[in-house]
From Swiss-Prot:
<dbReference type="GO" id="GO:0007338">
    <property type="term" value="P:single fertilization"/>
</dbReference>
<feature type="compositionally biased region" description="Low complexity">
    <location>
        <begin position="610"/>
        <end position="621"/>
    </location>
</feature>
<dbReference type="GO" id="GO:0035264">
    <property type="term" value="P:multicellular organism growth"/>
</dbReference>
<dbReference type="GO" id="GO:0043588">
    <property type="term" value="P:skin development"/>
</dbReference>
<keyword id="KW-0238">DNA-binding</keyword>
<keyword id="KW-0853">WD repeat</keyword>
<feature type="repeat" description="WD 7">
    <location>
        <begin position="292"/>
        <end position="334"/>
    </location>
</feature>
<dbReference type="Pfam" id="PF11816">
    <property type="entry name" value="DUF3337"/>
</dbReference>
<dbReference type="GO" id="GO:0000724">
    <property type="term" value="P:double-strand break repair via homologous recombination"/>
</dbReference>
<feature type="repeat" description="WD 8">
    <location>
        <begin position="358"/>
        <end position="452"/>
    </location>
</feature>
<dbReference type="GO" id="GO:0035800">
    <property type="term" value="F:deubiquitinase activator activity"/>
</dbReference>
<protein>
    <recommendedName>
        <fullName>WD repeat-containing protein 48</fullName>
    </recommendedName>
</protein>
<comment type="function">
    <text>Regulator of deubiquitinating complexes, which acts as a strong activator of USP1, USP12 and USP46. Enhances the USP1-mediated deubiquitination of FANCD2; USP1 being almost inactive by itself. Activates deubiquitination by increasing the catalytic turnover without increasing the affinity of deubiquitinating enzymes for the substrate. Also activates deubiquitinating activity of complexes containing USP12. Docks at the distal end of the USP12 fingers domain and induces a cascade of structural changes leading to the activation of the enzyme.</text>
</comment>
<dbReference type="GO" id="GO:0043130">
    <property type="term" value="F:ubiquitin binding"/>
</dbReference>
<dbReference type="InterPro" id="IPR036322">
    <property type="entry name" value="WD40_repeat_dom_sf"/>
</dbReference>
<dbReference type="GO" id="GO:0048872">
    <property type="term" value="P:homeostasis of number of cells"/>
</dbReference>
<dbReference type="GO" id="GO:0003677">
    <property type="term" value="F:DNA binding"/>
</dbReference>
Length: 678
């Protein structure tokens, strides 16, 4: 397969555009942390976040701010990471279906592997062979030679991979011994499947667990395997005997994370019950409750700078990562104060972590306001914030206020069609635009708070404007294709290039650091870049291959979509005593204000009726010709009422708002008119 290889199939697949509203530098994990890797040589900890970001931290306790850098290229949860090549290279697996290869020291992505067709959930690493395996929900296991991956370049971008077949269900855990002779997978099939990665031959299938196998470890020579399952048990397997040789019932709920010491004599376990235990594999009755976290445990990483390990790092569904000391654990065992009596449990060895890498808040709730432009959010700290989807920014932090009250406070009797969707999976606002409804929302410039240079009040398409802002730096959007030939002539004659089409949309810009993502509707990412980087040569070329035609139409060809039309019927109200008209079906822009319909009634229906009943003098005709539009508007409001469902309508309402809030029925909208009683 080819790293960075993207087939030019944008015309055949359904491509969506997404962007993330966020700060330029996101220093803190904004969601749970799925994986950890420790580099003891450089005193660095790598965290793989559900916010899609891999962060590097200093574990030097004397450093006031532990944050070093962020590694950003994924677009969904990062599920697993492994450090290779003595800490020089990091491999990551993500729910965006990719495996990425990083320069761990400099923090940049070197290549992207796209062989998986679904979430990549687990990685395994054979240190002696520099071999990495990846697996996920597509039931596939791929083997990668790390030295080959790190040698990839723009011209040499092809890498071969071996695959292990035979899994019948989604894979959630993977392990490979250091020597690279055995690989084991765990899945929702509730069995362990074992292969020889050198030949890709299936060796065995081990049965015993009754639920998903979430964690796996192998000893150095690949003769023993530890497994943790959602069934709440830890099992020790002999691969030589092809059977389970011990079962440890330590936890009250599912076991999601395991670590083991070098000698493979003590297992550290954590999971849904938030407790972390150390269990003696030779004597299962000897187990020590090390600590209790505040959230379910997702991953652990032993500090192996000494033997026995002096500490363990723990990641949970919360955004902070804790380091717990293990220094007193041996005295604890020697004294006999271990937890072998469930009816009279011993308190944990540690009540406070030794070190905390503080996390940030995650957005857990949102409400799109009626104007379909602003969003209210609530985070894990109960703070409420107000956001502008169009400008891709936070407008205001409202603090710890009542979320529902804020929604009520900002309610407006206005209807704008849905034109985007919101996802909170990463703990940040991800906005997605889809061809099916992206151009559904038209508003007037005045209502949107924008002024036009000529003082007019044009109708603006929100989705169209936003796409133009997101791709403002892409050179292809700067020159209308019709003017390219003429522009080249100007360039040749005058020595300068003339931009005939302004950059962006002329009304607003989005923050240049905004991540823009092109992906298939099923969730598979095609290309991610920062808004400001679309002017780069490589990025521009990839945009040419990736941007779908429906986006090209708006951003490059400047073809704005047509207005939405709404059909309706106009009839005299029953109280007016007027004869019911022939039921003609009318049609108008759904943004047409009620006052314009009132003017139509006054001018075309009421005036015509009056003229047919009286003989008009030439003076009256002359006066009628001089009557201004403004006068008609004033007279219409003075003399005419428009009703829907017997409710008098506000002249400032538009037809779509009337249909949504007042008509509320199937079929075409019906409006009634009557003259106001004098």
């Amino acid at each position: 397969m080819a790293a960075h290889h993207r087939q030019n199939t944008a015309g055949r697949r359904k491509v969506q555009v997404s962007y993330v509203i966020r700060d330029e530098v996101e220093k803190y994990n904004r969601n749970g942390v799925n994986a950890l890797q420790l580099d003891p040589a450089l005193n660095r900890l790598f965290t793989a976040g559900r916010d899609s970001i891999i962060r590097i931290w200093s574990v030097n306790q004397h450093k006031q701010d532990p944050y070093i850098a962020s590694m950003e290229h994924h677009t969904d949860w990062v599920n697993d990471i492994v450090l290779c090549c003595n800490g020089k290279t990091l491999i990551s697996a993500s729910s965006d279906t990719t495996v990425k290869v990083w320069n761990a020291h400099k923090g940049f992505c070197m290549s992207t592997l796209r062989t998986h067709k679904d979430y990549v959930k687990a990685l395994a690493y054979a240190k002696d062979k520099e071999l990495v395996a990846s697996a996920g929900l597509d039931r596939q296991i791929f083997l990668w030679d790390v030295n080959t991956l790190t040698a990839l370049t723009a011209s040499n971008n092809t890498v071969t991979t071996s695959s292990l077949s035979g899994n019948k269900d989604s894979i959630y855990s993977l392990a490979m011994n250091q020597m690279g002779t055995v690989i084991v997978s765990g899945s929702t099939e509730k069995v362990l499947r074992v292969w020889d990665p050198r030949t890709c031959a299936k060796l065995m299938k081990l049965k015993g667990h009754t639920d998903n196998v979430k964690a796996l470890l192998l000893n150095r020579d690949g003769t023993q395997c530890l497994s943790g399952s959602s069934d709440g048990t830890i099992r020790l397997w002999s691969l030589g005997q092809q059977r389970c040789i011990a079962t440890y019932r330590v936890h009250d709920e599912g076991v999601w994370a395991l670590q083991v010491n070098e000698a493979f004599t003590h297992v550290y376990s954590g999971g849904r019950d938030r407790k972390i235990y150390c269990t003696d594999l030779r004597n299962p009755d000897i187990r020590v409750l090390i600590c209790e976290e505040k959230a379910p445990v997702l991953k652990m990483e032993l500090d192996r700078s000494a033997d026995p390990p002096p500490a363990i790092w723990v990641a949970t569904t919360k955004s902070s990562v804790n380091k717990w000391t293990l220094k007193g654990i041996h005295n604890f065992r020697a004294s006999g104060d271990y937890d072998n009596d469930c009816t009279n449990p011993i308190p944990p060895l540690c009540t406070q972590p030794d070190q905390v890498i503080k996390g940030g808040a995650s957005i857990i709730q949102c409400h799109i306001l009626n104007d379909k432009r602003h969003i209210l959010t609530k985070d894990t700290n109960n703070n409420v914030a107000y956001w502008d989807v169009l400008k891709a920014c936070k407008v205001e932090d409202l603090g710890k206020v009542d979320f529902e009250e804020e929604i009520k406070k900002r309610f407006k009797m206005v209807y704008v069609p849905n034109w985007f969707s919101v996802d909170l999976k990463t703990g940040m606002l991800t906005i997605t635009l889809d061809e099916s409804d992206c151009f559904a929302a038209w508003v007037s410039a005045k209502d949107a708070g924008f002024s036009s240079p000529d003082g007019s009040d044009p109708k603006l398409n929100l989705g169209g404007l936003l796409l133009q802002a997101l791709l403002e730096y892409w050179p292809r959007t700067h020159i209308n294709p019709m003017d390219e030939e003429e522009n080249e002539i100007n360039h040749a004659v005058n020595g300068e290039q003339e931009n005939r089409v302004q950059k962006g949309n002329g009304y607003f810009q989005v923050p240049p650091h905004t991540p823009v993502i092109f992906g298939e509707a099923g969730g598979r990412t095609l290309f991610r870049l920062l808004c400001r980087d679309s002017g780069g040569e490589t990025e521009s070329m990839l945009l040419n291959e990736t941007v779908p035609q429906w986006v090209i139409d708006i951003t490059v060809d400047k073809n704005m979509p047509k207005f939405n039309k709404i059909p309706f019927y106009l009839q005299p109200h029953s109280s007016s005593g007027a004869k019911t008209l022939k039921k003609d079906r009318l049609s108008a822009s759904d943004m047409l204000q009620v006052r314009k319909v009132m003017e139509h009634v006054y001018e075309k229906i009421i005036n015509l009726d009056n003229e047919s009943q009286t003989t008009s003098s030439s003076n009256n005709e002359k006066a009628g010709e001089q009557e201004k539009e403004e006068d008609i508007a004033v007279l219409a409001e003075e003399k005419i009422e428009l009703l829907c469902q017997d409710q008098v309508l506000d002249p400032n309402m538009d037809l779509r708002t009337v249909k949504h809030f007042i008509w509320k029925s199937g079929g075409d909208l019906t409006l009634h008119y009557r003259q106001k009683s004098t």
